[in-house]
């Protein structure tokens, strides 16, 4: 894309891509990283999110350095962690994992942390961590089983996707909604603008959206 620096999203998440597009930013490439997202023993939620976002950015940078067309691009990575207290919930891929997450979240408060890592064209690293507090309604067993049947939870931190059916489970939310979806837009665009990325460049092309 001519007229602005190139930008790479270090993620294969359709949700993060859609959020970046929502802000009028279309990445020139996607570089999802194959990173082991298992929390370390005793690792706190904030530390886990920061570590994984940095690891994804590191992996994307190595890929970009080998690509003549992308070398010197901005790189954005993110990692989202859902936690009850200090307990980190998994990115559920199995029915049992998702069921356990939903039973734990039922009628309770939890926190969603997303760490963003920005790599500048000069390969400096900038990072932000965003926290949102969420409270779910008390879920019946019928709620849980029907939601499991939807398949919407698969691969999602904490076993739910707030932008879908699970949005109806939320009694209260304090903080950024887009953070819970997977990419806090205010903090992401502020980080980019602070490093000289022209965040308004694509706005004129979104009139028909």
Curated annotation (Swiss-Prot):
Recorded hits in Gene3D superfamilies, A to Z, give:
3.90.950.10
**Organism's domain of life?**
Bacteria
Which cofactors does this protein require? a divalent metal cation
Q: Which HAMAP family match?
A: Maf
This protein's record includes keyword Phosphoprotein? no
Q: What is its EC number?
A: 3.6.1.9
Site (Important for substrate specificity) found at 15, 80, 163
Instruction: Please explain the role this protein plays, according to its UniProt record.
Output: Nucleoside triphosphate pyrophosphatase that hydrolyzes dTTP and UTP. May have a dual role in cell division arrest and in preventing the incorporation of modified nucleotides into cellular nucleic acids.
Localization in the cell: Cytoplasm
Listed A to Z, the keywords are:
Cytoplasm, Hydrolase, Nucleotide metabolism
Provide one Gene Ontology biological process annotation: nucleotide metabolic process
What name appears for this protein in its UniProt entry?
Answer: dTTP/UTP pyrophosphatase
The GO terms describing molecular function are: dTTP diphosphatase activity; UTP diphosphatase activity
- Which species is listed as the source? Bradyrhizobium sp. (strain BTAi1 / ATCC BAA-1182)
């Amino acid at each position: 894309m001519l007229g602005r620096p190139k930008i790479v999203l270090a993620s294969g998440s359709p949700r993060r891509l859609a959020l970046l597009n929502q802000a009028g930013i279309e990445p020139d490439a996607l570089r999802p990283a194959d990173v082991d997202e298992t929390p370390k023993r005793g690792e706190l939620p904030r530390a886990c999110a920061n570590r994984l976002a940095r690891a994804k950015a590191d992996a994307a940078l190595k890929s970009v350095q080998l690509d003549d067309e992308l070398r010197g691009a901005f790189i954005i990575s993110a990692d989202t962690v859902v936690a009850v207290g200090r307990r980190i919930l998994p990115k559920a891929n199995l029915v049992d994992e998702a069921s356990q997450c939903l039973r734990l979240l039922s009628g309770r408060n939890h926190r969603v942390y997303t760490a963003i890592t920005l790599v500048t064209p000069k390969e400096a690293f900038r990072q932000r961590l965003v926290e949102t507090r969420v409270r779910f309604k008390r879920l019946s067993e019928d709620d849980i089983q029907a939601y499991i049947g939807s398949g919407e939870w698969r691969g999602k931190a904490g076993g739910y996707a707030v932008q879908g059916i699970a949005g109806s489970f939320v009694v209260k939310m304090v903080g950024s909604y887009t953070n819970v979806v997977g990419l806090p837009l205010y903090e992401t665009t502020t980080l980019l603008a602070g490093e000289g990325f022209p965040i308004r460049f694509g706005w004129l092309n979104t009139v028909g959206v």
